Amino acid sequence: MIDEEFQYDVKVINAFKSYGGTKVFNGLNMNVTSGSIYGLLGPSGCGKSTLLQCIMGSMELDSGCIALKAIRLKDVGYMPQSLCLEGTLTIRETFEYYGTLYNMKKKDIEIKKDELIAFLQLPNLNSLIKDISGGQGRRVSLGICLLHNPKLIILDEPTVGIDPLLRQEIWNGLLKMVVEQHKTIIITTHYIEEANLANRIGLMRNGVLVEEGAPKDIISKYGADSLESAFLTLCSKQDANEAPIKLTTEVQKTDKMQSTKLMEPGKKVDFVRIKALLKKNFHALYRDYWLLFTVFLLPIIQTTNFCNSIGGSFKRMEIAIQNDEINISDCKYFNSSKCIFDNNTSQTMSCVAINYLASLDYTLVEVKDRYTGEMLVDNSKFLAFIHFPKSYTQDLIMFIDRHEDYGMQSLAYMHFAKHNMLFKNQILLDVTNAIRYLVQTTLYSCSNNPKIATLPMEINILYGKDVKYHGNSTAAIFLAMGSFYFSSIYSVSIMLSEKMDGILGRSMFAGVTILELLISMFCISNILIVGHSFISIIIAYVLYPNPIILSSGIFMYVILVIIMSWIGFLFGLLAAGLTPTKFFGVHIMNGWALSQMLLSGGVWPIDGQTKLLRSVSELLPMRLAGKTMNDIALKGWTLDHPSVIIGTTATFAHAVLLLLVLIGLSKVKKNMWVIHK
């Protein structure tokens, strides 16, 4: 850059930039002299904010050059058009956050903060940003811009929504900075009367600055009595001489000179900035009650709900009973100690089966006849109907003593609904066990070996002998799902807030890198996952009777929970980079977590899936982690078991693969987590 250009703090040379089919800059030139206020005027949508972002380096020109005297971000103070501040921080915390990012000492932050309070008439410093008015918010935003005493100050519509009297005081303060501290200020405004206070102004229209100079010189040049009249004259002349500028296939041949770069990402991770980000994100989390509830308390509540509602035996199911032997209300007094083969016995063994079912918490209701019982079942009033004939006990003697003479009319009869397979299977199993128990009780009371009524088969359970319910074998998959889901909700919520509210973009102007933000988020996510996962595991395996075998594999069980949280965290970042709102981001999380839960055996074993679908399900991270965790908990497999090693390695490989996808996508889609406002 030649020396004469350095009489300017900012110099834009032959800038071209297009959006879609319309050019925003069409050979724009701009000169901002040192120690002056430059007022940039123009209608809404003409590209003023885009020009400022190009100067800051967050956007690039298609061609042309921007030369700056400033070479460090710290030398520039930028106030975006939108607020771009964390709403859950107080004004005091916001100043401390940005002061730390600019590597200011605490003492210097306090001194500068007191100056800005007096200058900008800021509200109570303990007020949350989200609770103050729009005008107050813009004053805080301006204060953040001035906090680190920058040499070049760039303000995008700083006085919008501010009281006219205070607006004048702010202008007086800016003029004083220029005179006493030799600051250079670029300010965009819609208020033409404000522009009269600037040392130099530029009117931007149709992609160029149609005029640039001191306000008095422009008024004199066009023989106008005010700046507004002069600009109206300029606009009329431009409309008469130019057609609207549209992008054509012709390529601009202007050489693209090297522009000054302020937004170069830092090569080293700054732990001071990470500490500031940790503090900010911690405040944002614990003051966002709904997010804190979702990512910490809700997993604990869901684990409790799971243990109370999934996989247990169904209770209080209604069964209609017709017992021609005895009223079922009298069965509670039945004593089975007498043998039915004794003379003059009055035993009614149907009571054994009825009492057995009652002990399983079935609701038994007596009906008068078979037709009524069957109709109640067919009309979905009851789930089953059981009939014991009048001579059931006497015929049972025949069944045991002379089996070949036992008639079909002596059988107990059952009619049940088939609309719910789980209900049907449980009732059928329990009634079968009740009749088996009835026969065994009869044999025992008559001093016979009750094993006569058992199957001639020895059953040896190798693994899972304590597994009694479906929930026992799906608890691990549920914990893996919770670890994935709630970590992903945290990362997608925080990152989309940073992205959509412009918070990350503004922090990057203060030197923050995306890597530093991700490190701070990752630390908080791990703290959350360790906290709620520990409590959830205690609930699932200590407070509720889900079986677990204590072995060295428990360490790997915990590691798998943490790895699943990493996968969820990374997937949330991916969704945040691809989606524009929290609504879409959260729905992606819901859909993917539910799909994995369905396909990984959390609802039904994958053995019931088609061969092709099962081959896909076996590769899902939730399946890999959940199956390995089940093997550790229910089979007692240890760290050195091949299946544990393979399952853990494959789950970790998913996290690495997702990380590589994020890195690659960030190279292809630049600024996918950043929106500059």
Enumerate the language-model features and the residues they cover.
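Helix-to-loop junction immediately C-terminal to a conserved catalytic motif
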Residues: 56
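ABC ATPase "signature
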Residues: 212-213
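Membrane-spanning alpha-helical segments of multipass transporters and channels
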Residues: 221, 301-310, 325, 467, ...
